Amino acid sequence: MIRKLLLSILFLFAVKISAQEDKSRFSLGFNYGFGSEFNNRNYTFTNHFYKIQLYYKLKQTKHFQYQILVQPEINFAEHQLLNFYFVKPETPDYEQKRAQYIQLKDIREYVLNCGFLVRKPIGEICSFYILGSIGPMITDTETERMSKGFAFADVLAVGFSLNYHKIQFDIRPNIRHVSNGGLSSTNSGYNTRNIEFGVSYSL
């Protein structure tokens, strides 16, 4: 439901953007972040990632600013199954899969997230914001929690920004969920907590 609502909002904003062009509304940025799974006895998952971010300022009111953004991302992760009983005996070749999945794995995720951001300026140079984003991704490794291939990444973040002329510095804690949306039988996915640091430039 949340995913459908965000997609509808992004579509409406994209239509509005196509009807008006104003280059001063755009910013281009780069973020680096890292994180790990919430405490979990079944598996470990640690990651670090790089994002390019294209912001578009949709609207400015007296108290708030509204932006949309596109975020191409590459994510480098390490995952290991800790509780091999997570792979049930009814799973085909379950003993072989247990032996396979319990090994430490390197995972690459290639993501294209689209987000909606609500910003609250504090004075002239500072602001706080809330960001929600969703998007498709490709993962290159099968695990006991998710099939290899197509999936989705959902992110909910809060952030703090500091502006200096046309440059903006960001710190952004977030919660991230990835899964394949039921497109494959293996769909437990991952839940991680992360923090990002970024810089962007107003074009």
Residue ranges and their predicted role:
Residues 37-42, 99-103, 140-146, 181-187:
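Extracellular loop and loop/strand-boundary signature of outer-membrane beta-barrel proteins
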Residues 162, 190-203:
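Outer-membrane beta-barrel "beta-signal"
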Residues 5, 20-28, 62-68, 124-130, ...:
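Outer-envelope beta-barrel architecture signal
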Residues 22-26, 44-50, 64, 106-112, ...:
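Residues that define the transmembrane beta-barrel architecture of outer-membrane proteins
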Residues 32-38, 72-78, 118, 134-140, ...:
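Transmembrane beta-strands of outer-membrane beta-barrel pores
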Residues 26-32, 66-72, 114, 130-134, ...:
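Membrane-embedded beta-strand positions of outer-membrane beta-barrel proteins
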Residues 19-68, 72, 202:
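Short glycine/proline- and aromatic-enriched beta-strand/turn motifs that initiate or cap beta-hairpins
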Residues 51-139:
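Gram-negative (and chloroplast) outer-membrane scaffold detector with strong preference
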